[in-house]
Amino acid sequence: MILEERSSWEGSKRYCIKTKHVAIICAVVVAVGLIVGLSVGLTRSCDSTEGMTQGTTQGTTQAPSHLPPVTSPPEDQGVCPASEDESGGWKDFRLPDFIKPVHYDLEVKPLMEQDTYTGSVDISINVSSSTRYLWLHLRETRITRLPVLRRPSGEQVQVRQCFEYKKQEYVVVEAEEELEPNTGEGPYHLILEFAGWLNGSLVGFYRTTYVEKGQTKSIAATDHEPTDARKSFPCFDEPNKKATYTISIVHSKEYKALSNMPVEKEESVDDIWSRTTFQKSVPMSTYLVCFAVHQFDSVTRISNRGIPLTIYVQPEQKHTAEYAANITKSVFDYFEDYFGMSYSLPKLDKIAIPDFGTGAMENWGLITYRETNLLYDPDESASSNKQRVAAVIAHELVHQWFGNIVTMEWWDDLWLNEGFASFFEYLGVAYAEKDWQMRDQMILDDVLPVQEDDSLMSSHPIVVTVATPDEITSVFDGISYSKGASILRMLENWITREKFQIGCQNYLKKHKFENAKTSDFWAALEEASNLPVKEVMDTWTNQMGYPVLNVDNMKNITQKRFLLDPRANASEPHSAFGYTWNIPIKWTEDDEQRITLYNRSETGGITLESTLSGNAFLKINPDHIGFYRVNYEVSTWEWIATNLSVNHTDFSSADRASFIDDAFALARAQLLNYKEALNLTKYLKEEKEYLPWHRVISAVTYIISMFEDDKELYPVIEKYFRDQVKPIADSLGWNDVGDHLTKLLRASVLGLACKMGDSDALNNASQLFQEWLTGTVSLPVNLRLLVYRYGMQNSGNETSWNYTLEQYQKTSLAQEKEKLLYGLASVKNVTLLSRYLDLLKDSNLIKTQDVFTVIQYISYNSYGKTMAWNWIQLNWEYLVNRYTLNNRNLGRIVTIAEPFNTELQLWQIKSFFERYPEAGAGQKPREQVLETVKNNIEWLKQNRDTIRNWFLDLNG
């Protein structure tokens, strides 16, 4: 699965800090402010630099979503009523080991017009201990007939009763007599008939719509990870309960059906209905089961080994699937070769779903996508969109091996799926698009952003205990994905690329079609490398956080846990490793790269075996290959700043990005004076590469936002960064030309120039916006987001806002829609922003998948920050009813409050959480928000004067 909301934990973070603390005032005033804040922009907040690179966000299509926002199907308990009976093992969260499914015969019949479906499933089950009870997962879907139970001989066993134990989402079937172990015999058969609803959510089996030639059409598809297969059909919904499947779909003759496997046969049921039956699958986990009923067209490529690779897409968007088809073939062939293992199925399909809750889902043989992540129009989409499509396609292809062929034993090892896919996606795209510098871009999109998250006390280990569906959902986050990818990058560099590849191949071969744990992967890499992989890497996966290496005299190194909050207790929560790490330290001496293993047992630190002396410089952690930060002595930081100014190309672009990110993070943690960090930015007038500029924008956004309301200082800060970015902004200009990285760079630096009030940049954005409003100009694809944002910000009014909304409704390309959504959110008009928030409840206009994106976009607007947060508070019950507390995007939306910095705002956040204590999948985001706001308040107290003096001294 790809996380569509990655912008909440990757790339530039958004911060808007007030310069004046506000005392806590009475609840009456707070309540009034909460309500009034929706109508007027009471508190000026920051425009974010988020989106300067047109990064990961969400999209939609012209088709209205029919999904009702708040209504639920009527309660119908069927023949298995709810019960609170806790006399058996079904009271436990985990399924028992003695009941094992081996095969499912599943038939489903969607009734599109009624928004319902019916189905039946015959599950072949092995029982290894005597029992009268069988229990399996079921949620929201109901059993319509008393289950049928048969012995291996075929003899029917009378069923005494069935009931739902909703606390653990089980349906329990009680037999009249004992079921004996069937070792050596055939399986038991449990047959259940069921019915469910196709509306109300974007999980399980659901229907959504799109428009084709003015006609509204429907598509029904599934989305099951992590615990939603149980919503589609009764099943043993845990990843280690692998079984084979034979799936049949009964559908209207107007439709076609897809599933994991190729079609085995199609037959007519009557004049209206057809039945499509698919070949028996390989053993797979329930969350990978997928089926869809559609009227789409397709584009196909054939792999080097003859596997058909097909993209299914709305007929009117067929041309936008060409790039996806090409990149799929290239990366697919690369991974078959790299992993040394053929893809396991006879075909691989991909389908773009018009309204899809996540970014993409790796269902074996039928990968489902949000349209923004699969479809690319070279005449309408930006370079960032192209890169996003390539990356998501590669990510999901990795899963066909890591996740599908070998699956984690339990969700606590989710990173074995997602960390690996997040790492290997870069290798796949690097092979297909060789000039994109994808291995270096991993620093920008994964390593450095997640280091910020992992420096909070509210972080968690990569391998983490999970014991509820909400906890399972919550670990689909930056730690599992980006930190997982980052430590694999470090590990690959340590043991060498060749041995890492061999270890991966051995791991896949040994555990093919089975489940595995983190220790199994370490064992495979130890065998390949003959290095202590488990001893080293357990310190990175089994405790949260990471170290900062303090360097003394260029050779002597000690480690300490890095935390953004200098007041935090670095020994909490308890860790068996005491927050020390076994660290493969990479360093360069005379252009020679070396690796020294820093064992955590060396409590006094280590000394690098360097022959350099005097003022020589050892670059520790070149290209930020290790998941740690480096803090040099002040004199060394001064030397780095001087040498950047003299000849910045003496350092690689990745090193320049790393220096800047480390320095600003260390300064936030009060481990380095901000003067030293800011001195590193003096050379930027000469910087011409994407990696450093991307990271500069992220690093300085916190400071820019913090002082935005300081009428004395902010203009000085604004002018400084405007002067620094102007040479590269003017050099690149507003002509959308150049290679891929040049186009990404142009969008970034022009965005910063606009943010810093550069008159030339703003005038260009406004002029292009006005020309676009005439309807006679097609904007350059890589400048559209800038024009929509800053054109709307500078010259937007009701007329231009309405025109933009009309264009949003007219365009069919999802990536263009997401840019227009951002433009609509950038208007400096509280009445229009309030109207925009009201539209979020109209699912015919704003798709269910896009609601949280719009809220985030509005929160980036200085006029909308307070409005967006207040709207969430006032509409929380509506949002919970529409999405459920198990929705990870709902859980994360509270992070839009992270920029707050006053005691009053902190109190408001606490009060909101106390009013709605059930967090569901949002428990960690809530902890993160509270910690971040507390840190912001303290940060202002500790750093305002130092930063003020540095900027004022520039003019002194």
Swiss-Prot record:
Residues 43-956 are extracellular. Residues 49-62 have a biased composition (Low complexity). Residues 48-87 are annotated as: Disordered. The active site is at residue 396. It comes from the Eukaryota. Its main location: membrane. Substrate binds at residues 225, 359-363, 888. Binds 1 zinc ion per subunit. It catalyses: Release of N-terminal glutamate (and to a lesser extent aspartate) from a peptide. The record marks 223 as: Binds calcium which modulates its enzyme activity. Its EC number is 3.4.11.7. One of its GO terms (biological process) is peptide catabolic process. The chain crosses the membrane at residues 22-42. Its cofactor is Zn(2+). Glycans are attached at residues 126, 199, 326, 556, 569, 599, 643, 647, 679, 764, 797, 802, 829. It is an enzyme of class 3 (hydrolase). The record marks 481 as: Transition state stabilizer. One of its GO terms (molecular function) is glutamyl aminopeptidase activity. GO terms for cellular component: cytoplasm; extracellular space; plasma membrane. Homodimer; disulfide-linked. This is Glutamyl aminopeptidase. The lineage of its organism: Eukaryota, Metazoa, Chordata, Craniata, Vertebrata. The gene is ENPEP.
